[in-house]
A protein has these predicted regions:
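Aromatic-enriched alpha-helical interface/lid elements that frame and gate functional surfaces
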Residues: 233-316
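N-terminal helix-loop segment corresponding to the beta1-alpha1 unit
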Residues: 1-193, 222
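Active-site-adjacent beta-strand anchor residues
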Residues: 77, 99, 202, 248-249
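Short acidic/polar mixed-charge low-complexity motifs
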Residues: 72, 196, 242-245
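Short Gly/Pro-enriched turn/cap motifs at secondary-structure boundaries
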Residues: 56, 64, 225-230, 236-237
Length: 319
């Protein structure tokens, strides 16, 4: 038996954060019904270039959608009155609703939290948006990069001092989906105690802000926050002779000592946190790594018991 066996979820969400949340709930045993608006499906097809594919190719892509796994899907234009009646009937028998529309959109269709609570006051309604249901940015549309930008997390990303960088991964999306699922589970426990439903307001910008927690806790005086980028030589990504890469993270002194002895530079040991020495050390480390292939370095680093990992591509990581 899974944690959410017997729970029913009505999922209005369309892009990554909301569907990731409902996918996690499905993995925990919930019965998830996904509402897909035909007009939204066509919009997404244009966004991702699927409109140029044949019908068979589009169907194959949809069938491979990880975030649809374990869910039932109903194609329903929620802008029609008849669709509203169907959704209200579904809401009567549901425990959880997940949505990712901007504030006011579902309310304007008569499908907001208050509308659904009239037929089911014990509903847990989880709303996922860029910047939440309140505040000056509540009506802003946007995806993962904007959450990273508005939270300040993007300002810390990358090694270049002249400009911030995009991580290239949907970090805020996945974090928000995970946080949303966690919030739903907490609301389920609370409902068991109180018998009351709950409205959950999940902002992608808040989830992305969590990425700043470490630096903010160490620097309550924001003027002391160090510049973006690496400031130490004991971590890095190094190109090998065969074009492969090795990542190292010898932050603890004992691992750094082992690494320095391995590459025959014990004089670096006391310079571990010396930012002035970093560039010269890194340049030398880079040249050293280019003398051997990735498998050769894996063997040497493993023997020396340092902290390292080959940088695997997705095919290698899935093996």
């Amino acid at each position: 038996m899974s944690a959410l066996d017997g729970f029913k979820v009505l999922d209005f969400s369309r892009l990554l954060p909301g569907p990731y949340c409902s996918w996690m709930l499905a993995e925990l045993g919930a019965n998830v019904t996904r509402i897909e608006n035909p007009r939204e499906v066509e919009k997404q097809a244009r966004v991702f270039g699927w409109d140029a594919l044949t019908p068979a190719e589009r169907e194959r892509i949809r069938a491979q959608d990880m975030l649809a796994r374990g869910k039932q899907t109903i194609l329903l234009d929620i802008g029609h009155d008849s669709a509203r009646d169907v959704i209200l009937r579904l809401a009567q028998k549901c425990d959880i609703v997940v949505s990712d529309y901007r504030p006011g959109v579902l309310e304007g269709l008569g499908l907001g939290p208050e509308d659904l609570e009239t037929v089911n006051p014990k509903l847990i309604h989880c709303s996922v948006t860029l910047c939440g249901q309140t505040g000056p940015y509540r009506d802003r549309p946007g995806h993962d990069p904007l959450a990273m930008a508005v939270s300040g997390a993007m300002s810390r990303a990358g090694d270049r001092l002249d400009r911030p960088s995009s991580l290239g991964l949907a970090v805020a999306d996945v974090m928000t989906g995970t946080n949303a699922a966690l919030a739903v589970l907490a609301a389920v426990i609370e409902r068991d105690r109180t018998g009351k439903g709950k409205r959950l307001d999940l902002a992608m910008s808040d989830s992305a802000m969590c990425l700043n927690a470490n630096v903010l806790s160490r620097h309550p005086d924001l003027s002391t926050i160090p510049a973006r980028g690496r400031r130490r030589a004991d971590t890095g990504i190094w190109r090998c002779k065969d074009g492969g890469f090795i990542a190292t993270s010898d932050m603890e002194p004992r691992y750094w000592e082992r690494f320095c002895h391995l590459v025959s530079h014990p004089e670096w040991i006391p310079l571990q946190l010396d930012s002035a020495a970093r560039d010269g050390i890194c340049e030398t480390i880079g040249a050293i790594f280019e003398t051997r292939t990735r498998p050769e370095w894996e063997a040497e680093l493993s023997k020396a018991q340092t902290q390292f990992s080959p940088v695997l591509d997705l095919g290698e990581a899935l093996e």
